[in-house]
Amino acid sequence: MGRLGAARTWIGARSSLPREVYVLGLVAFCVAVGFGVLVPVLPVFARSFGVGNTEVGAVISAFALMRLISSPFCGWLIKIFSERIIMATGIFIVAISSGLAGISRSYLQLLALRGVGGIGSAMFTVSAFTLLLTSVEAGVRGRAAGFFQAGFLIGGITGPAVGGVLAAISLTAPFFFYAGTLVVAGTVGLVLLRRRSAEPTETAESVVSFRAVVSDARYQAACVTNLAQGWTSFGVRSSLVPVLVVELLHRPASWTGIAFACAAVVQTIAVGPAGRFTDTVGRRPAMILGGTVAAVSIMAVPFAPNIWLLIVVLCLYGVASAFLGTAPAAAVGDVAGSRSGTAVAVFSMCSDIGAIIGPLVAGLLADTLSYAAAFGAGAVLMLVAAALSWRMPRDQRLSPKNGRSRGGPSKGEMHESTATE
């Protein structure tokens, strides 16, 4: 039932979303399947070169670090070449680097190729998200972001299962499978996505300067929320929950995978309702609700007395993540308008910063203080994000059919009025 519900969520809202959203969702699925196949074997493959855990961690960090460093340049590249070209180029860069990584003859070769892959990943992420936000009307941005998120989630659920089979064949097989899925994803994007028109989709919205975007309370709240989500998901949940399951709950490590899989299924099912809530009720309440529930649920993790309650808490966090994956993205599109490459790049960087710093701080707090302190830091950051979301101007309720507010001003008028509040 879980996978059936997830599939229904992923293919819902056919009447209101343009073709670009479906293509990007398919691309996201292909990328996530390959990534899910590779991630479990990457540390083991790195260890096969006779290196220690620090060097293994560097292979993981190199990808994230190069994503962070190269993200600021992606907005500039998009302005010159278009989202479609940069997205496909980025995907092919990751495909080539991943395939070559599978035949690496030394640790340094593997490290360098993963760094190159991080550059391609940044190009794909920023360009795909920019294209997603600028291809839809404001009234369906939440649902579009939810569909895109669901593509990643379903792929992420499927990938590890395929990866287990491939890893039994060879440690290098997942690298080639990942490269293959990326080639498919890049080709799909090039063939099925339309060339960018001369005029942006939303002609009523004027091009907004990046300085104006940064000063907008909605963008500030979205960026802090993305930072908190990167910190909490990667820094706290992914790095400490596996240790907590083994050391505090005294369960086999396999239970971590079961718990994460349950949470991912719940999150996938929740993205559809979260997207509709974001579009009909508003970005502001969705971000406040998501941030608050995420803070409470992540704080409850170290106090879970058994594995079953831990799974429930992680599923609750998955529901919150569904809201935090749709509402902030829609808010960025509302603020930046068309051709929002630089704004999306900075928004993406916030998550990367959280993902890089979060594991270090969480591990330090867990070692020097307690697990409760480590999870508490993530909860506090989530509450800060919710508080900043409270400062956002109250949303106009948008009609999904035409992107106009019900009983209010048009999109262009609404953008102008809310930006000055």
Language model features with spans:
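Conserved MFS/SLC helix-loop-helix module at the cytosolic interface between two early adjacent transmembrane helices
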Residues: 69-105, 278-284
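Juxtamembrane intracellular "pre-TM" segments in multi-pass secondary transporters
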Residues: 2-18, 195-223, 408-416
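Residue-level signature of mid-helix packing/kink "hotspots" within the transmembrane helices
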Residues: 64-72, 156-157, 264-272, 355-356
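Cytoplasmic helix-loop-helix junction between adjacent transmembrane helices
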Residues: 113-152
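Short amphipathic helix-loop junctions that connect adjacent transmembrane helices
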Residues: 41-53, 239-254
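Helix-breaking motifs and short loop linkers at transmembrane-helix boundaries and internal kinks
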Residues: 50, 82, 103-108, 250, ...
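Helix-loop-helix hairpin linking two adjacent transmembrane segments in secondary transporters
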Residues: 148-190
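C-terminal membrane-cytosol helix-exit motif in multi-pass small-molecule transporters
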Residues: 180-199, 385-393
